[in-house]
A protein has these predicted regions:
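A conserved acidic beta->alpha catalytic loop
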Residues: 25, 40-49, 88
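Glycine-rich, basic loop-to-helix element that forms the pyrophosphate-binding segment
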Residues: 63-79
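Short aromatic/hydrophobic "clamp" motif used to bind/position activated sugar donors
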Residues: 84
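Conserved donor NDP-sugar-binding/catalytic core segment of glycosyltransferases
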Residues: 98-127
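Single conserved hydrophobic/aromatic residue that forms the stacking wall/gate
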Residues: 128-137
Length: 137
């Protein structure tokens, strides 16, 4: 998996209750090197302060509130990785998400512009999973 550098762009607005877990799930990835970019749409809570306090390596960018698409595009422009991934600030990844995607792209020598993984949804119980999903943490 040589030559893969992934920048993860996390757009956010007023997500202090979720964003730390989202970034923790990125930081815990088995695949490295990573660049984590938080693009804050001018939150009115202390989202950016909490991220800066708990995750010193996260690059924090602030822009006036323009919506999630503008935040993603801003993050892409500021990214240094040769691959870009997105995670919404109220979501989390399995610890091997990027590893499995990079393996698949490398193994099949893909020049993919898009890679998608199955989702697992929880709310007091398991609502959906794929047979291929590894649910161990």
């Amino acid at each position: 998996m040589e030559g893969f550098n992934v920048s993860v762009v996390v757009p956010t607005f007023n997500r202090v209750d979720f964003v730390l877990e989202a970034i923790k799930s990125i930081s815990s990835q088995t695949f490295q090197p990573l660049e984590i970019i938080l693009v804050d749409n001018n939150s009115e809570d202390n989202t950016t302060e909490m991220v800066a306090k708990h995750f010193k390596s996260v690059k924090i960018l602030i822009q006036k509130k323009q919506g999630v698409s503008a935040a993603r595009n801003f993050g892409i422009r500021e990214a240094s990785g040769n691959w870009i991934a997105f995670l919404d600030s109220d979501d989390q990844w399995h610890k091997r998400k990027l590893e499995e995607q990079v393996k698949s792209i490398s193994r099949d020598k893909l020049s993919a512009d898009l890679s998608h993984t199955d989702e697992i949804w929880y709310r007091n119980c398991l609502l959906y999973t794929s047979d291929a999903a590894d649910e161990t943490t």
